């Protein structure tokens, strides 16, 4: 019986650059899901400057990892500006929003209680 494909939308056994997998488009938020299981969701985002996602809450802890550019993550009303190479964890259930300070790309990893 074949194994389930747990990571998708990338070529297996080949090196790649995460930021190259998703493109910034003017005024938009683009995403590419790399993995989704009952316990985790891994998604790449490309967010244009001043575009973003309005306030919402996730059912699990979410770690934002900025790959390129600069973005603002507001958690419980407190703004955090992150640049390439920086990360932040959003606690499960915390209201948060994300906005591009410049065009930016991020990897979002959400871990759910199992």
Language-model features and meaning:
Residues 41, 70-72, 79, 95, ...:
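Structural motif
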Residues 1-39, 74:
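A short, N-terminal "cap"/entry segment at the start of jelly-roll beta-barrel domains
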Residues 52-54, 88, 92-97:
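Histidine-centered metal-chelating micro-motifs
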Residues 28, 38-58:
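Conserved short histidine dyad/triad with adjacent acidic residue
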Residues 92-114:
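Ligand-binding loop in jelly-roll beta-barrel domains
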Residues 38, 67-68, 83-84, 102:
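A cytosolic small-molecule/anion-sensing beta-strand core signal
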Residues 77-92:
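Short acidic-glycine-tyrosine-enriched beta hairpin
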Residues 46-48, 58-73:
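Short, conserved beta-strand element in jelly-roll/cupin
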């Amino acid at each position: 019986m074949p194994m389930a494909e747990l990571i998708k939308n990338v070529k297996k056994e080949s090196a790649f650059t995460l930021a190259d997998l998703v493109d910034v488009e003017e005024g938009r938020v683009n995403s590419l899901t790399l993995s989704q299981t009952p316990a985790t969701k891994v998604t790449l985002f490309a967010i244009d400057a001043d575009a973003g996602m309005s306030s919402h809450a996730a059912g699990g802890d979410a770690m934002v990892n900025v790959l390129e550019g600069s973005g603002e993550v507001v958690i419980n009303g407190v703004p955090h500006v992150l640049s390439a190479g920086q990360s932040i964890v959003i606690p499960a259930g915390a209201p948060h929003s994300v906005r591009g300070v410049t065009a930016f790309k991020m990897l979002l990893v959400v871990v759910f209680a199992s």
